[in-house]
Amino acid sequence: MRLIPLKNTTEVGKWAARYIVNRINAFKPTADRPFVLGLPTGGTPMEAYKHLVALYKAGEVSFKNVVTFNMDEYVGLPQEHPESYYTFMHSNFFDHVDIPAENINLLNGNAPDIDEECRRYEEKIKSYGKIHLFMGGVGVDGHIAFNEPASSLASRTRIKTLTEETREANSRFFGGDANLVPKYALTVGVGTLLDAEEVMILVTGRGKAQALQAAVEGSINHMWTISCLQLHAKAIMVCDEPSTMELKVKTVKYFSELEAENIKNL
């Protein structure tokens, strides 16, 4: 596992965006051989999307031959709802870059057959071979995507019941009323994430410190689903200073020295 210790949210977003652009450009994608990118929603990746759009507008990257798969979507929320992840992705990213509509893959939380929708999503991912890079965030309780505590580490795309903690955390997008946050969501599984060639998790804020500590220094534990990344061959945690507050000083020092060349000139 790599840990990229940065100062603030802006640096986290800038580093993540540059990393994605470098990976896409090094891959040299074509229509027949697209780069497959996994994407999250929420507050944490907002800076990354802002910088990705800026890099696209600067002519440093094209998304024409990039295929995307999003992590999750609420069940029962209309697609056009301002807080649907469909709306979020189009407002913050897709509508500002040159990605073709047919290359965008989002879970349908209003599908008539939810189980079939989840199977279809998994099959679509497999049809591309694998996801080359999956960017994600982490919840205060260590969940990745909507794989809440006690999720199977072998799980695939499925419907999940959201915890009260998650609904409370997401209530800030629903006028502060947790009762307006849907109770269920479709999400890629932990196993789906682990199948990706590379996983990059963005961690920002003091509230995520315990989750980061569990991921980096704790044992592999389904109560902290983020800890599954210890099993991944190419996992990267990109974090700001407040989120490292629960890590041992020597842990932060170790990774700061190890990644010194990769975090300068931000």
Swiss-Prot record:
Protein's UniProt keywords contain Hydrolase: yes
BP GO annotations: carbohydrate metabolic process; glucosamine catabolic process; N-acetylglucosamine catabolic process; N-acetylneuraminate catabolic process
Keywords, alphabetical: Allosteric enzyme, Carbohydrate metabolism, Hydrolase
Pathway as given in its UniProt record: Amino-sugar metabolism; N-acetylneuraminate degradation; D-fructose 6-phosphate from N-acetylneuraminate: step 5/5
GO annotations of cellular component type: cytoplasm
Pfam families: Glucosamine_iso
Record-stated family: Belongs to the glucosamine/galactosamine-6-phosphate isomerase family. NagB subfamily.
Descriptive protein name: Glucosamine-6-phosphate deaminase
Organism: Yersinia enterocolitica serotype O:8 / biotype 1B (strain NCTC 13174 / 8081)
